[in-house]
């Protein structure tokens, strides 16, 4: 029952949703829901080891989008019931997802868009960052619209703020347009200002 989905495909969650859960084996997925107006609301990210599926959520308009190519494993409810090791693994990953969701809720409560974007970048640095000689590189390429949807603002505003951060030397982009957090100043500011750490 394992599966492969190419980057961007958003209907993974529709497969066998009432019988069990998916686990990311390789790749990164974005978890979201749609508002009544059709806007995307970010719920978090699923990395290798993360479990997801409609069986684990009350959200009706649950969506899963591959930020990279996804390799997934499928587990039925009976698999979880019969394996203490698998159940413990699922519990550990769900606890991590809960912390991630709490951080996103804290970000959404910040009044200034600039603060929301800074805290989102800091969370991305923690969750999806990898160390390089230039700084911390976000492992997936996020569009300005992705970031705007995550903090309830416009793409134009995100583009303007990213330009300001880049001029201030806080971040940059690699040749594939992945965000790179380049400055200790950004890390220190974000950590001291964040109310979810």
Give names to the regions the model predicted:
Residues 29-41:
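A short beta-strand-loop-beta hairpin characteristic of the jelly-roll/cupin
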Residues 127-197:
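Phosphate-/nucleic-acid-contacting segments
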Residues 42-99, 103:
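Cyclic-nucleotide recognition modules
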Residues 19-32, 48-49:
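Glycine- and acidic-residue-biased ligand/ion/polar-headgroup-sensing regions
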Residues 11-21, 39-40, 58-60, 135:
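A short beta-loop-beta micro-motif enriched in histidine and acidic residues
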Residues 2-13:
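Single conserved hydrophobic/aromatic residue that forms the stacking wall/gate
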Residues 88-153:
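Polybasic "coupling" helices that flank or enter modular domains
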Residues 23, 66, 180-181:
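Conserved hydrophobic "DFG−1" position in protein kinase catalytic cores
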């Amino acid at each position: 029952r394992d599966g492969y989905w190419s980057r961007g495909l958003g209907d993974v969650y529709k497969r066998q949703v009432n019988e069990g859960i998916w686990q990311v084996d390789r790749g990164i997925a974005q978890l979201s829901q749609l508002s009544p107006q059709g806007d995307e609301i970010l719920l978090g990210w699923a990395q290798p080891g993360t479990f997801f599926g409609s069986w684990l959520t009350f959200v009706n308009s649950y969506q899963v989008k591959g930020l990279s190519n996804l390799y997934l494993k499928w587990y039925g409810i009976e698999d979880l019931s019969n394996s203490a090791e698998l159940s413990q693994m699922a519990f550990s990953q769900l606890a991590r997802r809960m912390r991630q969701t709490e951080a996103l809720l804290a970000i959404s409560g910040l009044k200034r868009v600039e603060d929301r974007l800074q805290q989102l970048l800091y969370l991305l640095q923690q969750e999806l960052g990898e160390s390089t000689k230039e700084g911390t590189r976000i492992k997936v390429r996020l569009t300005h619209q992705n970031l705007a949807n995550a903090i309830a603002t416009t793409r134009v505003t995100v583009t303007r703020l990213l330009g300001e951060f880049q001029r201030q030397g806080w971040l940059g982009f690699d040749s594939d347009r992945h965000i790179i957090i380049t400055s200790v100043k950004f890390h220190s500011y974000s950590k001291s200002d964040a109310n979810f750490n």
